Amino acid sequence: MSTVTFFNPYLCGPRKPRAPSAGEGGAEGAAAARARAASAPFLQIVPRGCLYDGERGLLKHNCALAPRMFFRDRPYVLSKDLVWPTLPPPAVPASTTERAPRAPAPSADLLFHMYDQAETVVSADSKELIHPGYRHRITPCGVVLRLFGRTADGASLCVNVFGQDAYFYCRYGDAQSLHDRLYRLSDTLELAPVFHVRVRRVQRCSIYGYGTRPFADLYLVACGNWHVLKKMGQCLLDEGVEVFEVGVSPLTRFLLDKKIPSFGWCRLRRWHARPAHGRLSTAELEVDCEVADVRGVDDVAWPLYRCLSFDIECLSGGGAFPVAENLDDVVIQISCVCYPVGGTEEQRAAFPVAERHLFTLGPCAPIPGVLVYEFPSEFELLCGFFTFFGRYAPEFVTGYNINNFDWRYLLTRAERVYRWPVAEYTRLRFGGRFCAYVPGGGGRQPGFRTAQTKVLITGTVVLDLYPVCMAKVSAPDYKLNTVCELYLGRQKEDLSYKELPRAFLSGDAGRARVGRYCVQDAVLVKELFEKLNYHYEAAAVARLARISLRKVIFEGQQIRIYTCLLEEAAARQMVVPTFRSGAQRGAATGAGGGGGEETTYQGATVFEPTVGYHHAPVAVFDFASLYPSIIMAHNLCYSTWLRDDPGTPARPPETPARPPETPAAGPSGAAHAGGVPGATFRTPFRTPAGVPAAAAGGVGAGPPGGGAVSSASVGGRAAVSPSETPAEREPEPAPEDVFVVHVGQGVSYRFVRENVRASILSELLRRWLAQRRAVREAMRECEDETRRLLLDKEQLALKVTCNAFYGFTGFSQGMLPCLPVAASITTIGRDMLSRTSAYIEAHFAEPAFLARFFEPGDLPRADEPPPTVRVIYGDTDSVFVRFGGVRAGAIVARGEDLAAAVTEALFTEPVKLEFEKLFVALMMICKKRYIGRVFGSDALVMKGVDLVRKTACRFVKTVVRDVVELVFRDAAVAEAATRMSELTLEEMRRVGVPAGFHVLLQRLARARDDLFSGRVETAALVLSSVLSQDVSRYKQLNLPHLAVIRRLAARSEELPSVGDRVSYVLTAGPPDGRANAPNYELAEDPDYVAAHRVPIHAAKYFEQVVKAVTNTLYPVFPRGVVRRDRFLADLVPKRVYLGDEFKRHARPVEEEVCESERGGSGLLSSLDSSR
């Protein structure tokens, strides 16, 4: 019998089994025989079309042979020992069963770049081959941090860091009572008995509120079992005990306490290399070290990392959109694009891996430039892809919507359909995580997450470009095709999911066509990845905030500021309080009593604008980094806020005081007394024989400046004191050292000035803004493009993080809300804007002031009206100033000097007013809506108009843009618009429509003709709305985009995900339908409309055109007109449009010219209805 007992009957016709050649990757040698013997039977599912061209359906049968693939007509057994035929051979054995020479003893420091981390809890009975010198760190259990990266010479690396404890802080009466309480919690929570708790007294004060000295009853609670510690801290919090920094992971403690960059270079002083047969990871080098042996290195350069872009194609057994849980909805192809990221140009040019790969079911015709791997069944296809993934071992994985679809689909098929674990394909041979999940049940929480689905792969960073593009670009929809057109300037060759099955089942050539489409998507994502460079931006944020790269990607803004506060608080011997979720609102309000009423605060100021079409120059001045500058200028912070209830601890008012508790006796029955250190190390396990007590209860890595081991009681105090004594509080500062902010409604907040206590927020902002200035200066001097890009992303990360401080304090459901700080910031901002406006109107028009900044030729002559200066609008951090009679070029030349004069007169550093731009013409529509032409540019700046709104269709935007261009470019139209805005309706009745305005009316008439004549393509009529939550959670169901989703579901088509923009078109509806049917009855999927030639509702679209133009030209219409849209519609010449059934009987006639087109007033007789 031949050694090859199986070949794929679906790839080729009958053929003779070929004996494998020696050394071939697919040879059935000893490793392959072991794999076949050990492999369990699996279900083979393959489309019938792979065997019989054009046939539908699936073939299913159980197979007892080892899974395999075919590459270039050679079979390869998919085993753990497989050397992938197109990848460089691994530097270390693929399996721990093959031993490699032991690594030499380290003779120097080990320099490496870290990109990812994982934290695990390892017990003393672990099967890991751990160096004896680190065994005491995991007795009975301990945290081991896995740091993944690459060495300076490019070798992949896994560093196992021992000795980092997780800990939190807690106020309690004495250490023994606290320890006994924690011991009892272990039984209450049914926690695993393998843990060890250590308690010691420390000297810290709270960051929340000024005035408290270090607590006399504050204890640090540390434990080697991070999961146990987190639950115990939460239980204490729920029981009313005042706790601090609960939930801070040991990885975060490591990064903060040791000042380690979460994405950057590190150095190991001492380390021990693991032999190949004892490695837990698949890295080329694996070492063990103590937490104290790791040092950070200040360098932003990247080594060469591997990146993978992929895309999948699926085939539904029932013809509907594929659902992973359905057995018959199989994965048919997976494309992979491998490419380098980081490193030098020479390193990227020498990247040893081929770029394009395709994994396909069944035989496939060759595709130029693509390596094609063929598989007999879906299970083997998945096995091949994950094997390739493990062998290639990318540090970064990207794609488009891979979190919500591709990864979830692949993992569901592998784990639920085939019961096949995939965690072994991570960077850890066991104990790794390879999963996709939706935190918190799938609902979005603003400020916390930037993506709905999280994908966690140990040792690999997943960067989905779909949420990145949604955050960075404004588009009508976020399909890959649309985004590629915006960023790359080209579209992809599209293949709908309805065409795809026919092409795939048609034969080898059809599968090659599908393969080209699949590879094309992965290539486009690769180009988007390199265009956006979001990985550099995210890495810069990770370094700044000392959080992992995956937290930057998935966790939003709150965690970034929180970790920065943790680090700064620790440097000042402060602790950050933890609030119960129900008490977050109370923390945010800052209320002094126990009242349950919610306190709110007023937001930023928006001045009522002077609506109109302004021909005079309008200068825009704005404050540089308004909210950060307010924090720095006025020393605002949690730590400088003077609470009005000095006798109350710094906790939310809704958090109850800790219940009194007397010192409890230990389990042995003897009450603890005295200062015996061993008494605080009471554990629910027996010390193993031969292990010293100190080793079993090692202190590990504690926080900086740790305190002494506590005694059983503190000065004879009760176990819990409900508030600080007067001796524990700072003396009340002098009145001149207090800054008071009156926020309105009789509410005031007080903050101490910088000479009393420097604000933590101010210190962070000053440091980061100074760092940003230094980085931008380095950018100007940098000639290396790669380094310049890295520096640019670093300064952007600094800017974004600085601007996030206000939102961090003002979000009531955030991690550390504080209404006194947030309300004070907005109050001061409103006052600054008002004072700026008053100063400008009081001084800018004075002759002496103008003479300081302008030449006589820039101002009106003596026989002309004097110059006028008036503030016509103000919004949050900017003011719009209209200059009458001043030359525009002179205002631009002296704009910065004018802004500096205001800053010098009104404000102190670092507050700074800046000159932003000058409009030579501005149409102020209403608050937050305007259009203007900037001096020295032909471009129009628009805000809030339908032209820039995502909900408007392209056709409406085109018409509005044409109208705006006419108003700003055509002198006759501009003059007519100005004239019309000065008239009343009665005056217009007498004189008629200004002649130049008819050009605009003709454009609207042409738009109406295009709609009713069917000359507008469907793509230009697409409207869209965001699916903000699951359909079942909407209370109002008669919305157009929800109606479209229901229609898609009824046709078993692809459904959008939460957060997607749902596109739709308004159709004409049934012939016997209502004339004014609501939009949700007419909404339909654009692809369906285009495919079935469904007529559109021309009247509704023209109504949208008229309303959009009316909203844009709001200031132009005569005074006294109430229904402006109706007024404009009546001005457009009337026409009658015949239906198709009448057109064959119609005779062409000369089109009549309406009276209004000749400048007469005959049309105005019908305008009474618009009043």
Curated annotation (Swiss-Prot):
Its EC number is 2.7.7.7. One of its GO terms (cellular component) is host cell nucleus. It is found in: Host nucleus. Residues 663-674, 709-725 have a biased composition (Low complexity). It is an enzyme of class 2 (transferase). GO terms for biological process: DNA-templated DNA replication; viral DNA genome replication. It holds the Pfam family DNA_pol_B_exo1. The keyword Nucleotidyltransferase applies. InterPro entries: DNA-dir_DNA_pol_B, DNA-dir_DNA_pol_B_CS, DNA-dir_DNA_pol_B_exonuc, DNA-dir_DNA_pol_B_multi_dom, DNA/RNA_pol_sf, DNA_pol_B_thumb, DNA_pol_palm_dom_sf, DNA_pol_type-B. It catalyses: DNA(n) + a 2'-deoxyribonucleoside 5'-triphosphate = DNA(n+1) + diphosphate. Its main location: host cell. Residues 649-662 have a biased composition (Pro residues). Keywords: DNA replication, DNA-binding, DNA-directed DNA polymerase, Host nucleus, Nucleotidyltransferase, Transferase, Viral DNA replication. Residues 1149-1158 have a biased composition (Basic and acidic residues). PANTHER family: DNA POLYMERASE CATALYTIC SUBUNIT, DNA POLYMERASE DELTA CATALYTIC SUBUNIT. Belongs to the DNA polymerase type-B family. This is DNA polymerase catalytic subunit. It comes from Tupaiid herpesvirus 1 (strain 1) (TuHV-1).
